[in-house]
Amino acid sequence: MAEARDLFKEFKVQSVSEFFRRNAAMLGYTGKIRSLTTIIHEAVTNSLDACEEAGILPYIRVEIEELGKEHYKVIVEDNGPGIPEEYIPHVFGKMLAGTKAHRNIQSRGQQGIGISGAVMFAQITSGKATRVITSTGGEIVEAWVKIDVQKNEGKIVKKLKHPNPKGWRGTRIELEVKDVKYVRSKQGVYWYLKLTAIANPHAHIELVEPDGKLVVFPRSSEDIPEPPVEMKPHPKGVMVDDVYTMAHRSKRSSVRRFLVSEFSRISDKKVDELIKYITALRLIKSETNKEVKEKLYEKLVSGDVDSVLRAFGRKWKKELEKVAKIMDKSPEKLTWHEAEEIVEAFKLMKFLAPPTHGLRPIGEENIKKGLTSILKPEFVTAVTRAPRVYAGGIPFQVEVGLAYGGQIQGSEILRYANRVPLLFDAGSCVITSAVRSIDWKRYKIDSFDSAPLVVLVNVVSVHVPYTSTGKQSIADIDEIHNEIRLALMDAARRLSFYLGGKFRRMYQVKRRKTLEKYLPEIARSLHILTGEPEEKIKEYFLKLIESKIEVEEVSEVEAEEAEA
């Protein structure tokens, strides 16, 4: 029988980088087409975020050069603010590091894995370092970066510096990757950039394909989105560990000041109410009579905390004083049990909904501009819903765009999270289920699958509830599902109104053309019967038709459809 010490001889600590090196599929690196798209996604989202935060209209150029079979060089260049030299190894070589992961703020990337994951994938498939060229306006830094997967650290294997007489600013990265494939499919790079251009009409995006063809998605809006605002956590959306960890990191003088300063919707008055709720919970738990305990808890749930306290006579005042002392001590001395009591009380208390001023949707006008510029439809509409919350305190917002007809050939669902296209795992996404739940026939769309209709849905949040670290599918949460449905129905009503008018116009055109078709024969017959000139008879009937069947101006397409 083996001894415990022998069993643990192979025990080793694994770094984050080592874990994701072995489980690259969790980051979206699965399949030859998807892996290449994921690399582009990580680089482009970084570029867009950086440009917007710096107040720069994005110019992004993507080049894909074929070096051999399933072997490519990927180049992504932007005109962003650049990266300070000392941060290069951290940005490109350290997992779970970044400017967004630790902040309660809306952004395209959230986990601090993205671009370093792309660098690692390039490294493990080609063995080559990633070349980074960047400048913040001063000298140009050229660095070759690799990841030390054992230490989860970036390592610059070579570095050069160049003068910058023209004052160029931006970042260019070059990755060499193998076991990937470029195709113009709906899960490929071209489609990803096309969808990115629709949701980001302020960005100019260029793609040089492996065959040398240049594809340009021009900017259709000069408005730079306002940068999102960091938001404080809401009491209804935190766990015990959140409160405990935040308290021990806080520099505030007391737990009271910590709660008021670092959470939204908590004032001094609310802290006084919190003290009452914690006191009431302690007293209820000390009650031995089960029936009495249940009745008191029901009262507390209904919000009648004062009535609960009075039920314990003089006892409650002493307990209240003990709880009040918790609020006066240093937050770094808050115990786990006290943090549990705070969160338990939060769940029973009533708070205003969290502020939503930090959310930055695309906006109805920009959605229409993006859809019109890229898809060339005959009809377009957009709806941006008012912000809501899920999970008690996490703000989110839903917006929808519909594009119909024109150059659109068939139906398509364009899924986005914080303006980022979601190309994979559509079946498990709340957006897909919400779109499929709509009875499109009510809105004059006989068959959604064959209709020339594009549905765009963008979910905006400081914390998008993705189903996995691959960030390609949004969890089916009731509040989000319902908001998407409401937005879709609003937009679909507008489409229905447009189609109703279009069908009426087409019907009138068809009636008129049918009557005009038989007019020569009618005129000829009446000429024989009455002796009146044919032209005079035709002129009379033409005026009669025009007076009885008024036809609004129709497009050439509508006229052709009416004839058909």
Curated annotation (Swiss-Prot):
Name of a matching Pfam family: Topo-VIb_trans
InterPro entries noted in UniProt: HATPase_C_sf (IPR036890), Ribosomal_Su5_D2-typ_SF (IPR020568), Ribsml_uS5_D2-typ_fold_subgr (IPR014721), TopoVI_B (IPR005734), TopoVI_B_transducer (IPR015320)
Molecular function, one GO term: DNA binding
Binding site for ATP: 46, 78, 99-100, 109-116, 471
Keyword ATP-binding in annotation: yes
Catalysed conversion reaction: ATP-dependent breakage, passage and rejoining of double-stranded DNA
Alphabetized Gene3D superfamilies for the sequence: 1.10.8.50, 3.30.230.10, Histidine kinase-like ATPase, C-terminal domain
Keywords annotated in UniProt: ATP-binding, DNA-binding, Isomerase, Nucleotide-binding, Topoisomerase
Enzyme nomenclature, EC number: 5.6.2.2
GO terms, biological process: DNA topological change
Classification via PANTHER family: DNA TOPOISOMERASE 6 SUBUNIT B
Complex and partners: Homodimer. Heterotetramer of two Top6A and two Top6B chains.
Job of this protein: Relaxes both positive and negative superturns and exhibits a strong decatenase activity.
Family recorded in the similarity comment: Belongs to the TOP6B family.
Protein name: Type 2 DNA topoisomerase 6 subunit B
